A protein has these predicted regions:
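Peripheral, non-transmembrane regulatory/ligand-interaction domains of membrane transport proteins
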Residues: 1-194
């Protein structure tokens, strides 16, 4: 790959799914070594691996269903059109996160939330999006500079941190528009009338 990578579909190595792969590679030393999905696996002798996919692309969906090895319940949740934010753990150590963030893409309304779906295991993380997620791009940029995470937990933590950081100004503006006046005092006793 030449030039600075961006959050667009990048070609994968020969024999791999190329349409729908935004980036995929091995983590190590704060960097990512691009290799596409051809070399993706769960072998213990391989370094941690991160694949970021466009979930709207049928090639990416087919790869997930046929080759990723994700449990069927996780596949159903990660590929669903309608989702809710959640965290689920699976036997064998897998973790499914479905997160929401503010849509800061050009021309978008920040109130239109974007969804990031993450499957994380000890040695690999698969993230999926439909619309560009700047928090993911930030982590990718840090990896390109050699200053990124080297572990799966580090990737997930930094992506979540980026989502939260970008949500803060929108939340602050909502608080300034009267959100505080809608809050209830959770320390006072409830009064229920039949």
């Amino acid at each position: 790959m030449t030039g600075k990578p961006s959050d667009v579909n990048q070609p994968a190595t020969a024999g791999a799914v190329s349409k729908g792969v935004i980036f995929a590679g091995y983590l190590g030393g704060g960097t990512i070594k691009d290799c596409g999905l051809a070399d993706f696996g769960t072998a213990e002798d391989k370094p941690p691996y991160w694949a970021h996919l466009d979930r709207s692309e049928s090639d990416a969906q087919n790869w997930l269903v046929r080759e990723s090895g994700l449990p069927s319940a996780a596949l159903h949740a990660i590929l669903a059109e309608e989702t809710r934010p959640r965290l689920e753990s699976f036997d064998g150590g897998g973790l499914l996160l479905i997160l929401r963030g503010v849509n800061l893409n050009p021309g978008a309304d920040p109130e239109d939330m974007i969804t990031l779906r993450i499957w994380a295991e000890e040695k690999r993380v698969i993230s999926l999006r439909r619309f560009r997620i700047m928090a993911v791009q930030d982590v990718r940029d840090q990896l390109e500079k050699g200053q990124g995470p080297s572990t799966i937990g580090g990737v997930v933590t930094q992506v979540i941190g980026g989502l939260l950081q970008r949500m803060e100004p929108t939340i602050q503006s909502l608080q300034g528009c009267g959100l505080r006046s809608c809050a209830c005092d959770v320390t006072s006793p409830l009064s229920v009338t039949p």
